[in-house]
Amino acid sequence: MPGVTGAPVLTASTAEEALEAHRRSLLGLCYRMLGSPFEAEDAVQETMLRAWRSVERFDGRSELGTWLHRIATNVCLDMLKGRRRRAVPMDLGPAQAPVAENLHTRSEATWVLPIPGALVAGEDPADSVVAEESIRLAFVAALQHLPPRQRAALILCEVLSWQAAEVAELLDTTVASVNSALQRARATLQSRGLRRESAAARARLPDLQMLRRYVDAFQRYDLDALTKLIHADATQSMPPYDMWLAGRDDVLAWWFGPGIGCRGSRVLPVGTANGSPAFGQYKPSPGGFEPWALQVIEVEDSLVRQFTFFLDTERVFPLFGLPPRLDA
């Protein structure tokens, strides 16, 4: 992100609007660094506070966005000191059998949490495609395996298109060190089987007809219809439980076994989470339907390849604008 000399100097009267114009980009950076939309929002607030305190010292020798991203990166690095990394259940052990005895919870701080695509989408459609690709759950989870400074270097260079020299200045290191960090970071992501798809490929969200068929089949809990919509190698996870399932047969064995209480659920589309279709799921309860999970599905060849059910509805549903209850 090259700097531009001669940018307008900020004053207290012009700063607030100028700072807010960069909020989405800052939130995207902080989310990729931290793996939680709630921590990312805290980091953005701290970034704005630090920027506001020093706004009259901003002399316009670099772009305002560059200056803010430097502050935000340092805020995230401070927040990551001494923290354990966030993960997805697949990081923590092998797939398990679809039986209730395998359900074990871990704390909220363990998990990569979802973020609405609308919160980080840019105004330019091309920028939005890049943003959605780089907040995929698999990508964000893989980033958490990188040491914080490697993580920052990769995000700044490969997602935000900074030059290595700019990152070196921010991290107080050399260009050679940044390039070495990038090489190690890429190797780590590759070792974790992360596929870097083209922007054009990621832009092709599942067609609406396929999503409608899925919603209809799920709400009817129709085994035959669901079988036709789920990939043979599908996976399922349900944070905060660390159990995950591998294969369509085990997924459906769970749904029609221990998960049979989801029969009769209502499902509300909420756009995208992490670049993938997302739905609010409500289970039947006396007099209506109560929140159960935010479903995030990844689709491959018109079949659902991955299900993630985020069960912390008390926090996640408000984030996605979902109502606290549905009437019968």
Q: Language-model segments: which ranges?
A:
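A short, charge-rich alpha-helical start-of-domain segment used by transcription regulators
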Residues: 2-28, 38-41, 52
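Acidic, proline/glycine-rich intrinsically disordered inter-domain spacer in sigma factors
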Residues: 2-5, 10, 97-137, 200-205
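Short amphipathic helical patch at the helix-1/turn junction of helix-turn-helix
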Residues: 20, 31, 157-159
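C-terminal and inter-domain tail/linker signature
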Residues: 24, 49, 91-95, 123-126, ...
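Hydrophobic-face residues of short alpha-helical interaction/recognition segments
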Residues: 26, 30, 68, 72-80
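Short loop-to-helix capping motifs
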Residues: 35-37, 61, 221-222, 232
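Sigma70-family region 2
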Residues: 36, 46-64, 78-87, 144, ...
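Arg/Lys-rich amphipathic alpha helix in sigma70-family domain 2
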Residues: 73-91, 98-105, 191
